[in-house]
Amino acid sequence: MAIERGSKVKILRKESYWYGDVGTVASIDKSGIIYPVIVRFNKVNYNGFSGSAGGLNTNNFAEHELEVVG
């Protein structure tokens, strides 16, 4: 099954904050960059300023670091 926009994917990159989590593909860059797939998650990571609830809820991945689920 090919990865496309809107697909639900499981993260296989072990050093990622979202390892094992499921996110939604927001976009796929076709220009040949190393990490072309932008994945959006429901929770934010640990980045942010002290005292703020901010953080990132997207990250770039290579296609081999993702597994399509359902």
From Swiss-Prot:
**Record keyword Thylakoid present:** yes
A Gene Ontology BP annotation from the UniProt entry = photosynthesis
Name its cellular compartments.
Answer: Cellular thylakoid membrane
Q: What is its main location?
A: membrane
Identify the Pfam families for this entry: PSI_PsaE (PF02427)
Look up the record and report any one GO term of the cellular component aspect: photosystem I reaction center
> Which keywords annotate this record?
Membrane, Photosynthesis, Photosystem I, Thylakoid
- Superkingdom to which the source organism belongs: Bacteria
Q: How does it sit in the membrane?
A: Peripheral membrane protein
Q: What does this protein do?
A: Stabilizes the interaction between PsaC and the PSI core, assists the docking of the ferredoxin to PSI and interacts with ferredoxin-NADP oxidoreductase.
Q: Which family does it belong to?
A: Belongs to the PsaE family.
> Know the name of this protein?
Photosystem I reaction center subunit IV
Which organism encodes this protein?
Answer: Picosynechococcus sp. (strain ATCC 27264 / PCC 7002 / PR-6) (Agmenellum quadruplicatum)
Q: What is the lineage of its organism?
A: Bacteria, Bacillati, Cyanobacteriota, Cyanophyceae, Oscillatoriophycideae
